[in-house]
Amino acid sequence: MKDPRDVLKRPVITERSADLMTEKKYTFEVDVKANKTEVKDAVEQIFGVKVEKVNIMNYKGKFKRVGRYSGMTNKRRKAIVKLTEDSKEIEIFEA
C-alpha cells in the first residue's frame, strides 16, 4: 500500500471547488497512478473523515513551445471526494 501523503499531492482551490465545499465535496490533485480506493483510504487516514464517493478525472499534457524547443507539460489527475453526511468538514484554510 502506498503512503497516503504520496497519493494526495495538493488541494485544488478554484471558484468551482470552493462552491463544492458547501456540499462536502473536496477536490485534490492526486498521483497519476492512484486509483479510487487509494484516494479514499488516503483521505480517510489523513483527515480522519468517512468518504462516500470518489470521482477521478485525467488531464493529458499540453504541447508547449518556447522558440525552437518544444515539449509537453506533465499530465495530471484530479479527484473529487464526497464525504458522508455525518462526517466533519475538512479544514483546508487553517489559520
UniProtKB/Swiss-Prot annotation:
GO terms for molecular function: rRNA binding; structural constituent of ribosome. Gene3D superfamilies: 3.30.70.330. InterPro entries: Nucleotide-bd_a/b_plait_sf, Ribosomal_uL23-like, Ribosomal_uL23/eL15/eS24_sf, Ribosomal_uL23_CS. The keyword Iron does not apply. One of its GO terms (biological process) is translation. Keywords: Ribonucleoprotein, Ribosomal protein, RNA-binding, rRNA-binding. GO terms for cellular component: ribonucleoprotein complex; ribosome. The keyword Lipid metabolism does not apply. PANTHER family: 60S RIBOSOMAL PROTEIN L23A (PTHR11620). One of the early assembly proteins it binds 23S rRNA. One of the proteins that surrounds the polypeptide exit tunnel on the outside of the ribosome. Forms the main docking site for trigger factor binding to the ribosome. Part of the 50S ribosomal subunit. Contacts protein L29, and trigger factor when it is bound to the ribosome. Belongs to the universal ribosomal protein uL23 family. This is Large ribosomal subunit protein uL23. It comes from Bacillus licheniformis (strain ATCC 14580 / DSM 13 / JCM 2505 / CCUG 7422 / NBRC 12200 / NCIMB 9375 / NCTC 10341 / NRRL NRS-1264 / Gibson 46).
